[in-house]
């Protein structure tokens, strides 16, 4: 939903440039863009709304947005269409699931459908659990559950440690693309928040896989706090393509009618960023060119792409690229220069 999309967009510029505080300004960097998190969130909204198989819809959206930052195995799954899931426990199942919490009427249906939609790719038990926990939070929040009721249910049902605060997590938290290392932290960011924007800021302040973690938090926060503030909704909607905006507003009209969403949809095409985009302190490149030059491998590492047709680094090259974020950025910085 748009709360999840907002988290993805706001977090897009911090995934490889983490910050560990809430007081960043502005909320939306002028460099902010939607990533694979938003693409697959909208794809699920579309699939549910039109009652079309999610695997078919995901592959179509992939063809429309092939450079949105997907993982290596998802690239392969879309490109070769084997029809087989790849046993992933990554947080991709949780990032795209927010629509499930709105489209079904009982917690049992929500859990069943979250498993169903996750299992096209993320059929590992942890991948399924992450999608179910996120969907359950959203369902309970929109039904009026208290934060403590949500905390208790998720802890008992899924075994996640939610008896922490963001201040407990932040100092030692590092990049983690697993469900088990992202979903609990995203839920805690929501639980510690005071309103929608604060939830987004809490999630960003943890660092890690910022776009996906904040995407998960944003989806839950929207369900709990209600309509997203209008100025935030407009900026998020504006960053989507017209086709994606149309899918979003159609889904809301069917499952969660909102004048705020309709107005954001109407205003999005008229919204203009006031200042020209400036270079980042580290690097600046537009979304399309960035994802043409790199690829994520199965472990979530950013690697340089060898050719334009998605050939990947050989095993020797992969083994010799460290998983350390700062080192990766230093080695690949030349790829991102204008």
Locations of regions flagged by a protein language model:
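Structured, active/binding-site neighborhoods that engage oxygen-rich ligands
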Residues: 1-338
